[in-house]
């Protein structure tokens, strides 16, 4: 399928985009994550990544040279990195060749000047497809799935990009696995070999576990981590995702935390993106009495309530 994206609206730009077309024509393969362009508050790139990218650019005071995305899907996150960060070289990966090939075409055809950006890409596990490239990325972005596929489901069967194959050969700390942060940990472990000097990984993480768990995640991966931005969003694909967390909760993981969207809206009402990171733990504390377990959240969802979760952008860099 193909979608049309109004960039000015999608990225909340003050004027016309500088580097990408005004309207993106994006082909989305059957196995790629489908952007939520009809409801931007549910869209990871527009609602979570884009504000963080703008803040990165503001803090740096200049464009970045190189940007990478792990698990790009349609490539819309890479186009966002090009537009908001001014990246001249981009690397991107995804698990399946068909997804990466489509993403590359999407990126090329939606640039105002296709020759202005160097592309490095490949299909495979996390950052490994980029191992023979230039590496040294200033910004590495990842929004990887947390919920494993059920045993009888294959990654190729349907649009399973919100899930991952649980069987891994790498050693994963028990703490990380209990918090369902396996892929984020593995991405951080790999990333140190792909970062430029003073580069950082920006992990977009659904706050279904305590913020302290994210800081510990970075430490266990051998990096120095901080909460860069903190916000919330309505749970996308709630039937699938919340029930998935509830099942993992019953299996002994977690407990996980969700909230009614109305409670999240109140807690974040007066919080700017710029101030959100430094106030994250205080905001989390204010929501303590409103949190729901995954099981409770699923029951509330089945009764018609709108369920959401907090979102942290974790900034991790080499110590």
Spell out what each predicted region is.
Residues 44-152, 156:
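Conserved SAM/SAH cofactor-binding pocket of Class I
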Residues 2-89, 256-258, 262-315:
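SAM-dependent Rossmann-like transferase core, predominantly class I methyltransferases
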Residues 239-249:
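Short, surface-exposed amphipathic charged segments that create phosphate/polyanion-binding patches used
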């Amino acid at each position: 399928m193909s979608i049309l994206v109004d960039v000015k609206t999608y990225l909340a730009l003050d004027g016309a985009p500088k580097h990408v077309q005004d309207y993106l024509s994006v082909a989305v393969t059957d196995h790629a994550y489908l952007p939520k362009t009809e409801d931007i508050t549910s869209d990871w790139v527009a609602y979570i990544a884009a504000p963080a990218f703008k803040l990165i650019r503001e803090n740096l005071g200049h464009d970045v040279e190189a940007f990478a995305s792990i698990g790009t899907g349609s490539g819309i996150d890479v186009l966002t990195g090009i537009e908001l960060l001014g990246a001249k070289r981009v690397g991107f990966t995804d698990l399946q060749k068909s997804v990466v090939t489509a993403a590359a075409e999407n990126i090329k055809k939606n640039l105002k000047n296709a020759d202005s950006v160097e592309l490095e890409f490949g299909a495979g596990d996390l950052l490994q497809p980029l191992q023979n490239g230039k590496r040294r990325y200033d910004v590495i972005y990842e929004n990887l799935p947390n919920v494993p596929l059920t045993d009888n489901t294959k990654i190729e069967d349907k649009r399973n990009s919100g899930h991952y194959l649980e069987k891994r050969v790498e050693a994963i700390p028990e703490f990380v696995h209990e918090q369902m942060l396996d892929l984020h940990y593995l991405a951080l472990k790999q990333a140190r070999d792909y970062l430029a000097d003073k580069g950082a990984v920006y992990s977009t993480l659904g706050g279904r576990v305590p913020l302290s768990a994210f800081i510990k995640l970075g430490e266990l991966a051998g990096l120095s981590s901080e909460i860069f931005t903190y916000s919330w969003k309505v749970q996308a694909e709630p039937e699938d995702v919340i029930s998935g967390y509830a099942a993992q909760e019953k299996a002994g993981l977690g407990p996980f935390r969700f909230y009614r969207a109305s409670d999240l809206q109140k807690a974040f009402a007066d919080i700017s993106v710029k101030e959100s990171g430094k106030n994250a733990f205080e905001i989390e504390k204010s929501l303590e009495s409103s949190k729901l377990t995954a099981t409770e959240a699923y029951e509330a969802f089945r009764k018609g309530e709108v369920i959401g979760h907090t979102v942290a952008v974790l900034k991790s860099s080499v110590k």
